[in-house]
Amino acid sequence: MENNTMEKQFIESLKPTQADPSARTYKVPTAEIDYTNYLPTKWGVEYVQLSDEADELEACLLKGMNYLIEGDKGLGKTQLVHNLCFKHKLPIVPINCSEGTKIGDLIGRPQINEFGSYFQLGVLPTAIEVANKSEHKIAVLYMDEFNAMRHEIQKATNSVTDDRRSIVANGTTYQLNEGVRLAVVATINPSTYAGVNTLTEDAKSRFVGATWEYPSSEDMER
């Protein structure tokens, strides 16, 4: 409850005053990013692709494209993304999306600790900064179960997934540096799943992707 109240107060502080419409007051410093949190690690066994879905995903990652995967749970989507990042030494910023995902999770929110107040960046500006610091000038933002988020929360990703490749957080514009790429990979569950929302038209227009299916008995016998 305290965090929600503080977040509302912080948002109110960002609104311009009537006397000066351009005025903005930002009251807290932004916490530093620990880039070691986003180093890739290898997950489990190797993914066995059915056709060319893994190759297609890999190509999109290396080009810094937005890629959308629709498929049931348990197909190995998350494992494959992490293992491809490990293979190519690409830092990865993950988020498990849900109905409860808030704007603060994506953009950031004010926090308090024993040293005072600070602004904790969300995954969107964090992913941009991680990409800018990456040795290979590329990073991956992995948004699992993207369509579990409400429409207004989905829309908060628009400026990162379109040509702007930027986001404003705590009064600072976080922008990909020239030559730096950010691959945004999102997974969605089929519409038959509970707690699933439709994708906004904005999201549909910003991703390429494919539908993945469970292997058939014939596939398992290969």
Q: Language-model segments: which ranges?
A:
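AAA+ P-loop NTPase catalytic core and its hallmark functional loops
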Residues: E2-R222
